[in-house]
UniProtKB/Swiss-Prot annotation:
HAMAP family: UPF0761. It is found in: Cell inner membrane. PANTHER family: INNER MEMBRANE PROTEIN YHJD, UPF0761 MEMBRANE PROTEIN YIHY. Pfam families: Virul_fac_BrkB. Coiled coil: none annotated. The chain crosses the membrane at residues 45-65, 99-119, 141-161, 182-202, 213-233, 247-267. This is UPF0761 membrane protein MADE_1017605/MADE_1018330. Keywords: Cell inner membrane, Cell membrane, Membrane, Transmembrane, Transmembrane helix. One of its GO terms (cellular component) is plasma membrane. InterPro entries: UPF0761_bac, Virul_fac_BrkB.
Amino acid sequence: MDLDKVKTFYNNVAPQLRDLFGIFIKRCKEDNITISAGHLAYVTLLSLVPFIMVTFTIMSAFPAFASVRSKLEHFVFSNFVPTASDVVHKYMTDFVGNASQMSAIGILSLLVVALMLISNVDKTLNRIWRTQSDRPIVYTFAIYWMVITLGPMLIGSSVVVSSYLTGLAAFTEEYTPGLGTFLLSLVPSGAALLAFAILYMVVPNRRVYARHAFVGAIVATIAFEITKSGFALYVTNFPSYELIYGALAVVPILFLWVYLSWIIVLFGAEFTCSLGEAFENKKAEHAPRKVPKE
């Protein structure tokens, strides 16, 4: 009896999984996610310093986040930049310090560059979801401005929460050795998972089911953690970039990591979109059709 249930379950699920991965592979080829990731990586490096400067400027306007900056820098560079984090951190700090001395026109131009990154991410993800209608310009600008202003506040709040969890983990370590450290190690992955899910639900200009967004976010988070470990292992054991570029090795390493990160983001987006196309369309096909009354 149990064997019959397993066979029935397999016969029902296997075709859907086959359709899902078929749609996923087809979409990845059609959308050329590696090319889109390269474009986003270039725009990210161009917009990184302006975006960080705007983030820290907005956070400094709130006294509650005055002490968060150093914690935020440590959290980001230690968990999301697998190698050469100290060198990248130093360069970013110097760049942001130089940018903060610019005139009002210069700061405004940096703000435009930061908005350019958000705009490119928005357009790329909506192209993946095959969005037909564009948002009104006023509505689009309002969304971008909300990301610029509210984003730093949310980031600061998340860092405060992670600091609280660090203290809580240290407290639980006294009573349950190993448990606090294990739970604390899940914080970066949890932050990445939440960021992916929000990105896949909010950015597309169409409805995305939360369950699909979270499944896609789980896939992207697993891929991100595996890639981060593999990238760190490669750069540590095969330092060919340092032999070729010397002191400038951090530049291609950072670009390569940003490029791989965007591939993972688009990879998760394609998987999320494929879930909706495979399962929701299948439900629509099997839904009973209404017969018009005569």
